Amino acid sequence: MTHWFHRNPLKATAPVSFNYYGMITGPPASKICNDLRSARTRLLELFTDLSCNPETMKNAADLYFSLLQGFINSVGDSTQESKLRYIQNFKWTDTLQGHVPSAQQDAVFELISMGFNVALWYTKYASRLAGKENITEDEAKEVHRSLKIAAGIFKHLKESHIPKLLTPAEKGRDLEARLIDAYIIQCQAEAQEVTIARAIELKHAPGLIAALAYETASFYQKADHTLSSLEPAHSAKWRKYLHLKMCFYTAYAYCYHGQTLLASDKCGEAIRSLQEAEKLYAEAEALCKEYGETKGPGPTAKPSGHLFFRKLGSLVKNTLDKCQRENGFIYFQKIPTEAPQLELKANYGLVEPVPFEFPPMSALWTPEALAAFDLTKRPKDDSIKPKPEEEVKPVKEPDIKPQKDTGCSVS
């Protein structure tokens, strides 16, 4: 399933030296600043390192975030704000807005932005792993878990940290509610795709598969609706992907619902359900073409070329043919003019984000270390403050070549 998932670019950031020569009055503060600089550099490097795995990413992220906590919370009292929170300006681009960054002189902004990139890394890791030629069951579980972890990070940022920013996120930027909600919902939907593929492979009841597909389609529809008020120039490509996935999984729901109806001797209704699946599958095919032609951030996924996509077309056709034959020989039922209403509720397999918390403050942050930062010696002329409108060099992400499609789904 290489290139089955749409991915927006990673956020890019300006370098941060953590050099406060005049303010630092002792070795503990110097060590913290040196460690912060190297931990940040290391974490940024790992975002584009194809050999990086979740354990390596978690360790590197925890190290940086534990050090950064001393710039956010007071040592020994996490309810109090650190005196260092506003001494450093941070610049980050947004996933849909090109190379012109947002800038805030606030360590909370850095925590959120870097955390956002960690979540994006988990989604990209899941996409790469799902694209392996012969994915194992353990790898499929890791895809599933990585997407749930990403959803949990996005959710935690939205609920616990973005509200703490003094400067609210601008419209269309990553940290505003519409975008972060869309990322959360997309992660949940993609994790449920893994569940559906598994349920199909294990030949679970058609009713369960139909319900899971319907719930997944509803997730994609909700994510698309969340982005509907954004500028089309920024969101059109992403929304095409969400729309095509919504059509694809609604077609899946109608296909498997048709099988359930046939098993209940409701052949006429089954035929109508399969006809609806056929129509929606054709719509998904057309949307794949439109998606490929739509300009926007991120590389173009190629869902219509996958066996997982094409298998549905064959399944719909064969099941519809079977229903029509059975109706001609056995049932002789009238085919309804209206497609059946899908009021399906899955009782199993629904995805919830994995709860996330940032690590506690590093043990390097002692009262002595904090005291070694003397804000009275801070330069009065803050001429080093970067201008928000200056462009930040984009992250050069590795190009993932599609592997041979063997038809193995993430299962």
Swiss-Prot record:
SMART domains: BRO1 (SM01041). It comes from the Eukaryota. One of its GO terms (cellular component) is nuclear envelope. Farnesylation is required for nuclear envelope localization. Keywords: Lipoprotein, Membrane, Methylation, Nucleus, Prenylation. Residues 409-411 form a propeptide. Residues 376-411 are annotated as: Disordered. InterPro entries: BRO1_dom, BRO1_sf, BROX. Belongs to the BROX family. Nuclear envelope-associated factor that is involved in the nuclear envelope ruptures during interphase (NERDI) repair, where it is locally recruited by CHMP5 and reduces cytoskeletal stress through its action on SYN2 to help reseal the ruptured membrane. Monomer. Interacts with CHMP4B. Interacts with CHMP5: this interaction allows the recruitment of BROX to cellular membranes. Interacts with SYN2; this interaction promotes SYN2 ubiquitination and facilitates the relaxation of mechanical stress imposed by compressive actin fibers at the rupture site. This is BRO1 domain-containing protein BROX. It comes from Rattus norvegicus. The gene is Brox.
